[in-house]
UniProtKB/Swiss-Prot annotation:
Name this protein carries in UniProt: Deoxyuridine 5'-triphosphate nucleotidohydrolase
Functional description taken from the UniProt entry: This enzyme is involved in nucleotide metabolism: it produces dUMP, the immediate precursor of thymidine nucleotides and it decreases the intracellular concentration of dUTP so that uracil cannot be incorporated into DNA.
Binding residues for substrate: 71-73, 84, 88-90
Enzyme class (EC, first level): hydrolase
Origin organism lineage: Bacteria, Pseudomonadati, Pseudomonadota, Alphaproteobacteria, Rhodobacterales
Cofactor: Mg(2+)
Pfam family, one: dUTPase
Family: Belongs to the dUTPase family.
GO MF entries: dUTP diphosphatase activity; magnesium ion binding
Keywords from the UniProt entry: Hydrolase, Magnesium, Metal-binding, Nucleotide metabolism
GO BP: any one term: dUTP catabolic process
SUPFAM superfamilies to which the protein is assigned, alphabetical: dUTPase-like
Signal peptide annotation: none
EC number: 3.6.1.23
């Protein structure tokens, strides 16, 4: 497994005692990232969303991105997910990282200081060149979409 060096820095006002992102198992693809809200918890009412600070800034190597993804346990047990999943942090962004969380559950949910709120996955980036064409190659699927490949 290749290791990519990701430089981290505390954002202004962050509590530097909050643990840094960490892989919880040797086979984990995503490192858990935590809420850094030293001024108090963030309460999400049902249907509400909020930008939750992580207290981190990062320098992602060129040719990579960081994807921010929901934690499955929060989604299953509480209906907590991320609005723009996966969220992308580009290699040229240097600002504070926040996680846009949403409560799809039936009860209010409290995001506490230091809570594991999301996973971050470091992934390679491939950029494409875009060009208009007079024709596209034919496929068996053609223009079928939105459920066209299955019976249900």
């Amino acid at each position: 497994m290749a290791l990519v060096s990701l430089k981290l820095q505390w954002a202004d006002g962050a509590d530097t005692s909050v643990p840094l992102p960490a892989y919880e198992t040797s086979g984990a693809a995503g490192a858990d990232i935590r809420a850094n809200c030293p001024d108090g918890p963030v309460t999400l009412a049902p249907g509400a969303r909020a930008l939750v600070p992580t207290g981190l800034r990062m320098a992602i190597p060129q040719g990579y991105e960081v994807q921010i993804r929901p934690r499955s346990g929060l989604a299953l047990r509480h209906g907590i997910t991320l609005v723009n999943s996966p969220g992308t942090i580009d290699s040229d962004y240097r600002g504070a990282v926040g996680v846009i969380m949403q409560n799809l559950g039936d009860a209010a949910f409290e995001i506490t200081h230091g809570m594991r709120i999301a996973q971050m996955v470091v992934a390679p980036v491939v950029q494409a060149s875009f060009e208009l064409s007079d024709s596209l190659s034919e496929t068996d699927r053609g223009s079928g979409g939105f459920g066209s490949t299955g019976g249900d």
